[in-house]
Amino acid sequence: MKGGSMEKIKPILAIISLQFGYAGMYIITMVSFKHGMDHWVLATYRHVVATVVMAPFALMFERKIRPKMTLAIFWRLLALGILEPLMDQNLYYIGLKNTSASYTSAFTNALPAVTFILALIFRLETVNFRKVHSVAKVVGTVITVGGAMIMTLYKGPAIEIVKAAHNSFHGGSSSTPTGQHWVLGTIAIMGSISTWAAFFILQSYTLKVYPAELSLVTLICGIGTILNAIASLIMVRDPSAWKIGMDSGTLAAVYSGVVCSGIAYYIQSIVIKQRGPVFTTSFSPMCMIITAFLGALVLAEKIHLGSIIGAVFIVLGLYSVVWGKSKDEVNPLDEKIVAKSQELPITNVVKQTNGHDVSGAPTNGVVTST
């Protein structure tokens, strides 16, 4: 009994731990930007670290189950590398640099709704307006998009949750982003969420033909390293930007590479297999709350009223989508039970035909069932 309960708790603890991990990434990355870290270089180093860390595990544990590489699989891997390590990460970093850590983490709660819209476009999701849960998915998506629009168009007065001490974390360029930069950052975050959602959809297809999760993560990060290195050589002209040392930039690269591009990818794929994508996304608002507190405490960020109102709408919309989606998904065990119950009248009730069952064995006039 205790073992069964522990198995149910493990996915919950894993996803909650990831929310703390993501919140830490928001803060550490923002600190590195304030100290002059270039986001193209950071994305490159991040995926170098992730590749180096994950490759040994892929080689050790998936040597016998790793599928053969084909051209079709390679093109999918290349597309995954473009969508997440290159486009999503750099758009996200641009958004983070031009807004704030708490704002960015709040906006990413729109991810499930964007994924739902893309799933409708690609016919991976259906809507039946006669069903309450289908209507809830549509209404939740509209509410989430509305919350995102509020955060974009209405900034409102600043609200200081925690009075932060002025320590070394606040060094560097700590000025509040201007309105123009805020809009640019918001557009970048929207692009980041869209490419991230597309990444999840393509990843679900890829896992069906390439089910070795560790190897998949390693290959995606490896391709992401190459793509980001090429982009960095084009976009970054200052050689000193590549210098690394014992500073916040190195910490951001190592932390985000290990926790958010390596471990997180793997844990999410495992939890999605066990409990489904709805369960995985339902904990994302926790990251927003943790980041808002840490951002106020560590970075002296002020949360604006528009961000709070928009975040409330996003969370309400998110849970409406999550609830509706959960009604679409049937637990595999439940499916087996339903299937078995449907088979009982046909397969388990033995027909009597002159004292013989369907197979021809004598029944002695007795009807049996299993």
UniProtKB/Swiss-Prot annotation:
The keyword Cell division does not apply. The chain crosses the membrane at residues 11-31, 41-61, 67-87, 102-122, 142-162, 182-202, 216-236, 252-272, 278-298, 303-323. GO terms for biological process: amino acid export across plasma membrane; amino acid import; amino acid transport; intracellular amino acid homeostasis. One of its GO terms (cellular component) is plasma membrane. SUPFAM superfamilies: Multidrug resistance efflux transporter EmrE (SSF103481). Its main location: membrane. InterPro entries: EamA_dom, WAT1-related. Keywords: Membrane, Repeat, Transmembrane, Transmembrane helix. It is a multi-pass membrane protein. GO terms for molecular function: amino acid transmembrane transporter activity; L-amino acid efflux transmembrane transporter activity. It comes from the Eukaryota. It is found in: Membrane. Residues 23-143, 195-322 form the EamA domain. Belongs to the drug/metabolite transporter (DMT) superfamily. Plant drug/metabolite exporter (P-DME) (TC 2.A.7.4) family. This is WAT1-related protein At1g44800. It comes from Arabidopsis thaliana.
